[in-house]
Amino acid sequence: MSLFRDDGIVLRTQKLGEADRIITILTRGHGRVRAVARGVRRTKSKFGARLEPFSHVDVQFFARGGELVGRGLPLCTQSETIAPYGGGIVADYARYTAGTAMLETAERFTDHEGEPAVQQYLLLVGGLRTLARGEHAPHLILDAFLLRSLAVNGYAPSFEDCAKCGMPGPNRFFSVAAGGVICGDCRVPGSVVPSAQALTLLSALLSGDWATADACEARHVREGSGLVSAYLHWHLERGLRSLRYVEK
């Protein structure tokens, strides 16, 4: 029997029995963890209020087998709020749908429980903080998060040099299968020709150039979002359910 303590973001919850929940948390040190939180569905449970999606929490787990992941679900025995990001997200539809897509993305990229994913965790914390504060348009924050999640998981798209031969850009064509922009010599079936403004926007979102991103016209934002969605779908092998609800 062992106790484990970690920081984490609550990704989702599901009912268990009459009063309990299974909590899925992306933690800093142990990756994605599922744990049982007892009694949290009772009306007066302050413990349960801290374990809602979007919450950044300091949690304690009790594992009977001595390992946090492997022999049945551990118990979540204690939680303290670090930052209640949900308060600045759930009341606004655009923020809520963008945030839900961010949580789903983080879970999809951490499909092996118990494997540390520190970069993904830090991206999620930063993304939810920015979203809750309303620092930029929700759909831009989401696209930046999606691009950076792809990058930290080894799928960074190229928006300048040819993704196949490395020919210096700018290059005209874009292929999700090839890994981003490609030159005329490397053009493959299914390539598209996005606007230069859309590619500039995506490059800015990936690098954190918010001045450029915030100034982009709505039509180029929609175009860029379509490219991000297609690229993410290709690498995850299926789309995100929550993306269909995001307002662009």
From Swiss-Prot:
Matching Pfam families: RecO_C, RecO_N
For the biological process aspect of GO, one term held by this record is: DNA recombination
Species the sequence originates in: Streptomyces griseus subsp. griseus (strain JCM 4626 / CBS 651.72 / NBRC 13350 / KCC S-0626 / ISP 5235)
- Family that this chain belongs to: Belongs to the RecO family.
Q: Which SUPFAM superfamilies match?
A: ArfGap/RecO-like zinc finger, Nucleic acid-binding proteins
Q: Which GO terms describe its cellular component?
A: bacterial nucleoid
Q: What does this protein do?
A: Involved in DNA repair and RecF pathway recombination.
This protein's UniProt keywords: DNA damage, DNA recombination, DNA repair
Q: Which InterPro entries match?
A: ARFGAP/RecO, DNA_rep/recomb_RecO_N, NA-bd_OB-fold, RecO, RecO_C
The entry's protein name is DNA repair protein RecO
